[in-house]
Each structure stands twice: as C-alpha cells, then as structure tokens.
Amino acid sequence: MAERRPKKTESFKYKITFKKTGLSRFLPHHNMLSFFERTFLCAGIPVKFSEGFSPKPKIVNMGALPLGMETYCELISVELLKPLDITPENLPNLMKELSRPFPRGMEIVNIEPLKEKLSKHFPKAMVYRYTPEAIPADLMERFNSKTFPTVTNHRGQEMDLNQHVLSIDNQEGTLYIKVKCNDQGTTASPFVIFAGILGISIDPAKLDEVSRRFLVAKVSMEW
C-alpha cells in the first residue's frame, strides 16, 4: 500500500528579509505577496502550492503592515521546488535578480534557510523611527515617570502608552522607540503611539491619511 501513495515532492524553505521604502510603502499587503510570487516565476524558480480545492502559493508573512509605513526588516517565508544558491559569493547577485521586478523602494536584503515556521518564533519588540518637527522638552521625564496618556486606537479601544513603550532614544532629533509586541508578534499602531507621546492630534480611524503626513519606519525587531 505504501508504494501506491504519491511521493511527496521535495521542497526548500527560506526566510526572506526585505525592505519597503519610498512610494512602495503604500503597496497593499496582497499586492506585496503577489510581487514575490511573480518574481520567482520570472526567475524560473517554481513556488510550491498548497494542496486541496483552491491551491495557493506557500508564501507566508508575519502580518500586514500599516499602509504607508516604511520597513527595513520585513519577513516572509517561502517554500520552493528548487533550491537557491545562497552562498556568500552568489547571494548579492541572487537578491538583486529577485528584487528586479519589484516596484522602486522594495528590495530583498537577506535570504537564509528557514529553520522553523515564522509563527513558531514571534518577535518580542519592534523599533520604530520618526523625525518630528519638535520634541517636547519633558518627553523623557514623562517616559521615566510613566505619565504618558491613554489614547484610542483605530478600533476605538483604549491604550495605555506606558504599557507599550519600552524605551525611547533621541538621536539628533530623530526618535527611536521600542514597542512591546503582543503574543502574535505585532504591536499597536506606531502612528498612534508617536502621536500620543508627542501630543499630536490625529484621527485613529483615518490612519491611511495619517500615514501620508508622518514618515514612520520599522527599523528592527528584537527576539
């Protein structure tokens, strides 16, 4: 009986780190994943599909980014039917080739073998960057004394910013804030957090408009 079972096709799993900057930060989540499927197709590298009535490419990310936010450390996993040559000598050329079909500002910055599913290892915190027009003189005092306000997110839920902001680093007028992740590896909206700690009035229900006014970037993740 065992011989009658169809043999499983060998596959190769990779973790890909990429960035989205400039106008590509407005690329919707679904379109972004489609670009990855397309770039492997253009390179002649077949992507493995799921089985069943409606097969889908085995490309997985860690959740949709807020529209309009830059990222320098976004992750996806992909399962391929052909191995990639990711030796140190070939990796730069491979990343350049695979990034070629992407819109300007979107680029692969690393490829490595996937050791475990992304859902098995979520980040503990994320670091966001923003350069405001002005920084309140008492910002660090309020952080240290845990007197940041409670604000409302886009779902109408209250958020105590003191429970979310883990650290603040002011580097010549550019703020880097470390924000705690939930158990799914995501954080509260950095737009809402920056607005709250800086005393900027925004409508959390209209974050698409807010993202056009504030250039916030996700620069790193901590595990």
What function would you assign to each model-found segment?
Residues 48-83:
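Short, charge-patterned binding micro-sites
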Residues 71-127:
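Ordered, amphipathic secondary-structure segments that act as subunit-interaction surfaces
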Residues 18-20, 78-86, 130-135, 177-183:
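Short beta-strand-to-loop capping motifs
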Residues 8, 142-223:
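Core RNA-modification/binding signature centered on pseudouridine synthases
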Residues 25-30, 85-92, 183-188:
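Ordered, soluble secondary-structure elements with a strong preference for glycine-centered loop motifs
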